């Protein structure tokens, strides 16, 4: 990695719809306009269909979650306990942070992530 460029990591929990990840992708595109050559890695629970990502932006899909009618977060498609899914998602996020080494970590909407899944990463950073 060329450490002369800005590395930005973004997080969108995205348990319902695509609004959060779309907002982060808009911010990422604007960031590249203002700081050409930057690298932006977006971690999200949903993958927007047919998203044309410019050079410098990429997206990592986290295992999906959903918010049920009582406001509780649950695995969307995997038949595992939410604590196990939290561990999987948290581990992916932490691994990306340790290898990508972002200069900036932007979290959309839920400051410590769903179930607090960002706490290990925030502590590391």
Describe each model-derived feature in a short phrase.
Residues 5, 12, 30, 34-84, ...:
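Conserved nucleotide-sugar phosphate-binding/catalytic loop shared by glycosyltransferases and other
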Residues 9-10, 106:
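Structural motif
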Residues 12-25:
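A short, glycine/small-residue-rich beta-strand->loop->alpha-helix junction that serves as a flexible
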Residues 16, 65, 110-112:
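Short glycine-rich anion-binding loops that position phosphate/pyrophosphate groups of nucleotides
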Residues 48-50, 105-124:
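An aromatic- and histidine-rich active-site surface loop
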Residues 75-115:
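Conserved nucleotide-sugar donor-binding subdomain of glycosyltransferases
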